[in-house]
């Protein structure tokens, strides 16, 4: 009896000691992590939701919450304020922000999402707009007040040697942009190329001209994944973990875009998966642009970024020039082999 009692007591003790270990393995402690998008939830940013759905962030020890944005410029101030640790924002606007706030940078780019900026102006052909930027002369073009495509126009004007006021701006909000083009209140509007899918669904392709900034010889890096400098300095491992999970999801989104759109629809049930799939096809062209074939996703050519910094500083008459290394910090990028484009 005593032996049986001893054995059962020992078994209970072993179970009690083992239980905390089993519990800790089943529910590892996750680090809360806030990420801001540049805009609303669409196929453009589907990899973030695929990573979330498939548990890649949790696998890296992160409890990631993803919030909609208010534009690719606003993301920078959200991160600088400390409300968000990371986000998606325009790198030209980051250059301008750093130049206006000299000293130790508050925000850095850590992964180049759009290897080329998807900046376009979409114009109505019945208003005489062709793929020649000079056809915009005297026209009325809609754009949000603070929007990166609009902000980058002076770089195109400089490259083409035309005046900044070649056309007239009509300030509107993002939600009204398609409507004013369709109604004919304006002659065209600025877009991210992939954002224009909503307009393409309402007007026939043969009715529209798409003027790409890249066709004017303006080769800019676009939206990048940004991080607060406090985070990159104090906890670079956290940034690296987020980038590993996201990079994995970007690769898988390119390989299986249907799955990526399905994951996005879980978060935003009102989206049309067919429309978002078409949007992603355009997005992918800018994410996996030619440069990525040599250095992989997420990285940059230093000389190209230096030229972009010089261009932004000169065009906007900024008083200081941020160092390229302060704008883009590649130290936390995933291994090159994980970033080589597989599709």
Regions found by a protein language model. Give the residues of each.
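Helix N-cap/coil-helix junction residues
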Residues: 56, 62, 162, 204-205, ...
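Short, glycine-/small- and polar/acidic-enriched structural segments
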Residues: 26-173, 180-183, 187-193, 211-213, ...
């Amino acid at each position: 009896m005593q032996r049986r009692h001893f054995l059962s007591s020992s078994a209970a003790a072993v179970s009690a000691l083992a239980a905390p270990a089993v519990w800790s393995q089943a529910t590892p402690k996750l680090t809360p992590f806030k990420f801001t998008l540049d805009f609303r939830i669409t196929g453009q940013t589907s990899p973030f939701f695929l990573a979330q759905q498939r548990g890649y962030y949790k696998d890296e020890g992160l409890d990631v919450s993803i919030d909609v944005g208010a534009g690719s410029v606003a993301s920078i101030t959200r991160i600088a304020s400390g409300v968000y640790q990371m986000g998606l924002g325009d790198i030209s606007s980051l250059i301008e922000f750093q130049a206006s706030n000299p000293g130790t940078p508050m925000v850095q780019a850590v992964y180049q999402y759009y290897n080329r900026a998807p900046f376009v102006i979409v114009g109505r052909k019945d208003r005489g707009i062709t793929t020649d930027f000079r056809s915009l002369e005297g026209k009325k073009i809609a754009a949000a007040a603070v929007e990166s495509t609009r902000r980058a126009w002076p770089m195109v004007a400089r490259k083409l040697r035309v005046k900044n006021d070649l056309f007239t701006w009509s300030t509107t909000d993002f939600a009204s942009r398609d409507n004013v083009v369709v109604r004919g209140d304006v002659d065209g509007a600025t877009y991210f190329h992939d954002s224009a899918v909503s307009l393409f669904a309402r007007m026939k392709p043969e009715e529209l001209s798409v003027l790409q900034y890249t066709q004017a010889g303006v080769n800019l890096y676009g939206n990048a994944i940004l991080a607060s400098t406090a985070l990159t300095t104090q906890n670079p491992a956290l940034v690296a973990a987020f980038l590993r999970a996201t990079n994995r999801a970007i690769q898988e989104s390119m390989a299986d875009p249907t799955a990526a759109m399905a994951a996005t629809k879980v978060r935003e049930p009102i989206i049309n998966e067919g429309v978002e799939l078409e949007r992603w096809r355009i997005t992918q062209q800018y994410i996996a642009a030619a440069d990525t074939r040599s250095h992989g996703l997420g990285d940059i050519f230093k000389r190209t970024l230096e030229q972009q910094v010089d261009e932004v500083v000169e065009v906007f008459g900024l008083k200081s020039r941020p160092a390229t290394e302060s704008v883009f910090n590649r130290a936390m990028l995933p291994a090159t082999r994980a970033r080589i484009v597989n599709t």
